[in-house]
């Protein structure tokens, strides 16, 4: 997918880049697969900020995505490729032979007119086909991977993401995650063949602050620019460096300090992600 540039009508627009929409079909979205999500703007049910630097952003409708791929042994045809405002990859509208329509994440190479199918048994290894991990050959590139059978894909879903099957051991399949982490996942879990499309998303330049505001991202203020009451780095006469190691507003070390809690599933991690 090509990256497009813009004429520098304003200084901020000079360095802004975007993605070409030539792959998107000019069909309206399926209304039955659209829904409105509540805008929390980073607040909890008490109205207090629990996630900083968030706001409402541009109005948008959520597309209901089929992450479970549980419509087994019924062929579907890709009838449209659409933009999804809630994710950085494209989505594909699949029309099945029984008339049902579902959205799936578009893998690289999946185009209008292609066939997709999912099954609990084995299938040909083709982009967009979904099956259980135990039926996928070692070395295959996959995405939209379940962590628990039947729960729906949770891993490798963003633009350009993919994982690889590295081996098998007992009832587990060894997966190399996009981060480089090696992990056991139950062989009964579903996964989809291929790499998530729109990999060029990582190369676009936001270019201007207003574009992030449209995405619902508010500006971040440096701790050193605050008062002492607001941040451990705050205060001082003029520009001053922080004393000691950098910390969060709540005093937690900000660089290199491990905050991950131990949990039962840690035993399924063979090796940690690469730095």
Curated annotation (Swiss-Prot):
Record keywords, A-Z: Ribonucleoprotein, Ribosomal protein, RNA-binding, rRNA-binding
GO BP, one annotated term: cytoplasmic translation
Feature: compositional bias, Basic residues: 257-275
A GO molecular-function annotation: structural constituent of ribosome
UniProt region (Disordered), positions on chain: 220-275
Classification via Pfam families: Ribosomal_L2 (PF00181), Ribosomal_L2_C (PF03947)
GO cellular component, one term: large ribosomal subunit
Assembly and oligomerization: Part of the 50S ribosomal subunit. Forms a bridge to the 30S subunit in the 70S ribosome.
Role of this protein: One of the primary rRNA binding proteins. Required for association of the 30S and 50S subunits to form the 70S ribosome, for tRNA binding and peptide bond formation. It has been suggested to have peptidyltransferase activity; this is somewhat controversial. Makes several contacts with the 16S rRNA in the 70S ribosome.
Family per record: Belongs to the universal ribosomal protein uL2 family.
Name used for this protein in its record: Large ribosomal subunit protein uL2
Species this chain originates from: Wolinella succinogenes (strain ATCC 29543 / DSM 1740 / CCUG 13145 / JCM 31913 / LMG 7466 / NCTC 11488 / FDC 602W)
């Amino acid at each position: 997918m090509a990256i497009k540039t813009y004429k520098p009508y304003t200084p901020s627009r000079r360095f802004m880049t975007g993605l070409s929409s030539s792959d998107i079909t000019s069909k309206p979205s399926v209304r039955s697969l659209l829904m409105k999500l509540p805008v929390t703007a980073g607040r909890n049910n008490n109205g207090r900020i629990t996630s900083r630097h968030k706001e409402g952003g541009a109005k948008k409708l959520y597309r209901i995505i089929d992450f479970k791929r549980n419509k087994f042994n019924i062929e579907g045809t890709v009838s449209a490729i659409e933009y999804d405002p809630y994710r950085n990859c494209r989505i594909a509208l699949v029309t099945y032979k029984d008339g049902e329509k579902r959205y799936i994440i578009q893998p690289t190479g999946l185009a209008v007119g292609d066939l997709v199918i999912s099954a609990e048994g084995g299938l040909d290894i083709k982009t967009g086909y979904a099956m259980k991990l135990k039926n996928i050959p070692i070395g295959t590139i996959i995405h939209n991977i379940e962590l628990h059978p039947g729960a729906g894909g949770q891993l490798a879903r963003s633009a350009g993401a993919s994982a690889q099957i590295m081996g098998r051991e007992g009832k587990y399949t060894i997966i190399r995650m996009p981060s480089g982490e090696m992990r056991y996942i139950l062989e009964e879990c579903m996964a989809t063949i291929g790499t998530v499309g729109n990999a060029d998303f990582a190369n676009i330049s936001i270019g201007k602050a207003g574009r992030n505001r449209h995405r619902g991202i508010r500006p971040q203020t440096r701790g050193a620019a605050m008062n002492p009451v607001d941040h451990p780095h705050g205060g001082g006469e003029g520009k001053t460096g922080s004393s000691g190691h950098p910390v969060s507003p709540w005093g937690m070390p900000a660089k290199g300090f491990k905050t991950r809690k131990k949990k039962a599933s840690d035993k399924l991690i063979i090796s940690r992600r690469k730095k």
